[in-house]
Amino acid sequence: KADNVRVFELGRVFFPDETVGDSETTVKGVRQPLHVAGLVYGDAHEDCWAEAKRPVDFFDVKGDVENLVAPLKATFEAATHPAMHPGRCARVIVNGKAVGFVGELHPKVCRVYELPKPPVVFELEVAPLCELDVPSARAVSKFQPVHRDISVTVPNDVTCAQLQDAVARIRRTKPEAMIIESLDLFDVYRPEASAEKSMAFRLTLSTQGSEAIGEKDAEAAFVAVEQAFADLGATLRK
């Protein structure tokens, strides 16, 4: 048995679909979308003095999927799939459309094949990943970005994606939030037997204007983010 495996496959899958007719590229009654699938098993990286040895996990392959669909942005939501672990599986969404799944192989399948560690697998539909807009150049700001860390306490059922989506909405609708460049999660703490968790984000502000971001502008953007978080039940940690 191989200790470490990295494999992928690109090919067509077949579904019955009576809306499909005969043509030079199709067969009546059969839909044949192109899919890409991959499997990672074993250690997360080769032996290295700078890295502790550990098995590959869900988040390693989630990162691979994000790199695969770039420059499009993938989001993930908890899901179930008959071939995947019921608690370690996510639906992959690109441009608002579900394009596939990523997750650990189901424990029952691992037992059948006597695998001591669970492989992490993914499968994606290819066509939506090719729907790219023509990129447009963006001027580089003359000023350094402003960073501010935000720590909040949120109910356990509130996800990072929900909070980031809320901030994306206010960027489009509130003038004071348009200087927000990104909101990145860098820490999560879940106390035992608690209905809440703590999440820490780094807020980055940037402007293409002729003036640097002032303290009042930064504070207004921060308050807008705080209000967006509050709508989801998040409270600012003092």
Regions found by a protein language model. Name each.
Residues 2-11, 17, 24-25, 31-32, ...:
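A carboxyl-terminal module marker
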